[in-house]
Amino acid sequence: MIKVLIVEDSPVVRELLSHILHSDPQIRVVGVAESGEEALKEVVRLRPDLITMDVNLPRMDGFETTRRIMEEIPTPIIIVSAAWVSTEVEKTFRALEAGALAVLEKPSIAARDYDIRARDLIRAVKAMSEVKVIRRWSRSPRIEPAPPASGEPDIGKITKRFEVVAMGASTGGPTVLKQILSDLPDNFTIPILIVQHMTQGFIPGFVDWLSRAANYPVSVAVHGEEIRPGHAYVAPDGLHMGVNALGKIILTKGEPENGLCPSVSYLFRSVYRAYGENAVGVLLTGMGKDGAYELKVMKDCGMITIAQNKETSVVYGMPGEAIGMNAASYVLPPEKIARVLVKLAGSVAP
């Protein structure tokens, strides 16, 4: 039985979330909290397996509440937010940065896709309740040992020009992508194509959040747009993203792959067909296996492939699947991924 604490100041939304979660026999709502302060008390008293968190709470907002919980009693947290409210979107991504695992749009009984959102909530609660979260934001500073990782490529042996970097991520991906992009310099020359699994409606806010951290433009991909050096492009809601040999973005409403659209597998396959060995594939934290097999094909084509290491992955599903099939040339934490990409961008044959 999965024990859930609902943190939400709206009685109507609290009741709706409780109704949805109680419809599954494997889930039990053990408590509700109307404010951040109450949530902090209830999480200690009830010890839930998972928390659903609103971001707009009286006095202490969802970001600060998430930060405090991850500092004091780490617990899996799903942010349940309104995608159409810009202030909520901003707080949502700050909460992800503080340690929340995922974001879902608030369900509405009047919405046409109510049944889909209800199923998504139940599915997310079941999946995220199994994630082992770690303590964050310690009051007392301490020095953490660097996580183990394999060595970085010997850039001196690489003499080809890399035309594009393709990245895929799911659960835990937003903060990792933010770290990698913010660690790349403003003169980074390789275009980056990104697929991040995310609830529909949040991609524009996600891109805006990323662009404020990055040192170069980050935008939602547009069909037919030519990819440019020093730019990052994020796949939009509900469309597979690929690229052709002319360097133009191709968006298509195809069947889901691995149950997902956009799919990392689709992006990776498109990239190795268009660029062969002159591309880099990066598979980051995430649930499932999207992109793992295609990363193996990339490596077999002679491409540089990178998977995030287990120690820094929120969920080791996608990179773990890839590593298990020997699909990764290098297994690295996010900060080393950024350093390797910088070196690859400068590794052009004279």
Swiss-Prot record:
- Posttranslational modification, per the record? Phosphorylated by CheA. Phosphorylation of the N-terminal regulatory domain activates the methylesterase activity.
> What residue stretches are annotated with the Response regulatory domain?
3-121
Gene symbol here is cheB1
Sites where 4-aspartylphosphate occurs are at 54
Stored Pfam families? CheB_methylest, Response_reg
InterPro entries tied to this protein: CheB-like (IPR008248), CheB_C (IPR035909), CheY-like_superfamily (IPR011006), Sig_transdc_resp-reg_Me-estase (IPR000673), Sig_transdc_resp-reg_receiver (IPR001789)
* Keywords, ordered alphabetically: Chemotaxis, Cytoplasm, Hydrolase, Phosphoprotein
Which GO CC annotations does the UniProt entry carry?
Answer: cytoplasm
PROSITE patterns recorded for this chain?
Answer: CHEB, RESPONSE_REGULATORY
Enumerate the spans annotated as CheB-type methylesterase domain: 148-342
- Name of this chain's protein: Protein-glutamate methylesterase/protein-glutamine glutaminase 1
KW Phosphoprotein (keyword) present:
yes
Q: Which Gene3D superfamilies match?
A: 3.40.50.2300, Methylesterase CheB, C-terminal domain
Supply the enzyme class, top level. hydrolase
Annotated domain remarks? Contains a C-terminal catalytic domain, and an N-terminal region which modulates catalytic activity.
Q: Name one GO molecular function term.
A: phosphorelay response regulator activity
Active-site annotation: 170, 197, 290
Q: CDD domains annotated for this entry? A: CheB_Rec, REC_CheB-like
Q: Where in the cell is it found?
A: Cytoplasm
Entry-linked HAMAP family: CheB_chemtxs
Q: Quote the catalytic activity from the record.
A: [protein]-L-glutamate 5-O-methyl ester + H2O = L-glutamyl-[protein] + methanol + H(+); L-glutaminyl-[protein] + H2O = L-glutamyl-[protein] + NH4(+)
Principal cellular location given in the protein's record: cytoplasm
A Gene Ontology biological process noted in the UniProt record is: chemotaxis
Per the UniProt entry, the Enzyme Commission number(s) are: 3.1.1.61, 3.5.1.44
Query: Record's family?
Result: Belongs to the CheB family.
